[in-house]
A protein has these predicted regions:
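All-alpha RGS (Regulator of G-protein Signaling) helical domain and cognate RGS-like helical scaffolds
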Residues: 2-29, 43-44, 61-392
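Twin-arginine (Tat) signal peptide motif
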Residues: 31-36
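N-terminal export signals
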Residues: 37-59
């Protein structure tokens, strides 16, 4: 259990999402000169040129890597996603999590935190610890890539989005976010997918799983207070907290599928081990948040700025596809319908998994406001991961 330490709210963090050179300061220096040169050049690039520049530098750096290009790509793409994930979890933590020196923080927003605690009284701890986990994921993946002579993922040039200006945010990060939590369109079909014993997206790619919260999949919704005005509308603030509660598992179920999908392409046994060791932690996050989301209070609220309405239904129902009590993954068809049904993560089909994950996040609205250079860079990383093939 984490406790608040107000004396270190704005202090440095041992898991600060800073330049990779700082993270690697304590690592052995052997053969790091060319990689450090690579880092200094890429970090200095402007957002307008970083797409092409980073991609060409990545290809050049791979020449001396002890990893195959495919295995490096299988780690670099999730490293980039983990950087993005850490970025939005840090935003959640600044406003609604525990403020201490373990993760980068703000000073907290009492009204938002209280709205979250209506859903789960340990919400601040959960947000804090999930934030911590995602930071360690991208730091480890990038450090491992560099230790093998491969280029890391680097998104520093794309930290250009505004983010929230509400009380509690880190003022130094306003205008320097990677992700946008204020215009989300959230696909909650995972809720019914994991309760359905007859369908699996790997076998039924055209089957449409019903939404748990249909209005979240329509229009755009904010999961954090955009400014202090948002906290003055009690019912709408509850809707913001509910939106966050469903955004959390929506993100984490994606990681639960991505890691095992990419692992099927790995050649190096250590790369396989990394993917299979990080992936289950995403599933642990998903399981926690999927349980928490069921506690979101039923309500209907209207965004006072956009006029968009959102309705959170009562999920304490007899319908087994929607019943919030049924949190265990229902057995379903897997590999072939000639085999017995089995409880599994789904989907895990490796074909196009990385591009599918990137499309999912883009359609969610998480990158609204990002540059074309950002999308070019992320698309290239995803395509290279999807192109990887097992070498035996």
């Amino acid at each position: 259990m984490k406790t608040a330490d107000n004396g270190t709210v704005n202090g440095s963090s041992k898991h600060e999402t800073g330049p990779l050179e700082d993270i690697l300061e304590k690592k052995p220096r052997k053969s790091f000169i060319s990689r450090r040169s690579f880092l200094s050049k890429t970090i200095a690039l402007g957002a307008g040129t970083v797409g092409a520049g980073l991609l060409s530098n990545i290809r050049a750096a791979e020449t001396g890597s002890s990893l195959s290009a495919g295995d490096a790509a299988l780690l670099r793409f999730p490293a980039a996603l983990e950087i993005l994930e850490a970025d939005f979890w840090i935003q959640y933590n600044e406003l609604g999590g525990i403020q201490d020196d373990e993760v980068p923080g703000g000073s907290g927003n009492e009204a938002y935190a209280e709205a979250l605690e209506v859903i789960e009284d340990e919400m601040g701890d959960y947000i804090h610890d999930n934030t911590d986990d995602e930071i360690t994921h991208h730091q480890f993946l990038n450090a491992y890539l560099v230790s093998k002579g491969a280029a890391p993922a680097n998104l520093d040039a794309f930290r250009t989005l505004m983010g929230s200006t509400a009380t509690g945010v880190n003022q130094n990060k306003i205008g320097h976010r990677l992700t946008n939590l204020t215009r989300l369109q959230i696909d909650t079909s995972w809720w019914t997918r994991y309760r359905d014993d007859s369908h699996n997206p790997d076998l039924d790619p055209n089957f449409v799983f019903p939404q748990a919260v249909p209005t979240l999949a329509q229009n755009r919704h904010t999961a954090i207070p955009r400014d202090d005005a948002d906290t003055t509308h009690p019912l709408f603030l509850k809707a913001i907290a509910n939106t966050a509660a469903f955004h959390f598992p929506t993100i984490e179920q994606g990681g639960s599928s991505l890691y095992p999908a990419l692992a099927q392409k790995a050649t190096d046994v250590e790369v396989l081990r990394i993917l299979m060791s990080i992936g289950p932690t995403e599933t642990m996050h998903f399981q926690t948040w999927s349980d928490v989301a069921g506690n979101a209070p039923p309500l209907t609220a209207i965004d006072p700025k956009t006029g968009v309405s959102v309705t959170f239904p009562d999920l304490e129902v007899e319908n087994e596809l929607l019943d919030k009590a049924l949190i265990m993954p229902e057995p379903c068809p897997f590999l072939s319908r000639s085999l017995p049904i089995v409880s599994v993560i789904r989907p895990t089909n490796p074909q196009g998994a990385a591009m599918g994950a990137l499309r999912f996040l883009r359609n969610m609205g998480l990158f609204i406001g990002q540059s074309q250079a950002f999308f070019a860079y992320m698309t290239q990383l995803a395509q290279e991961a999807d192109a990887a093939t097992r070498g035996f």
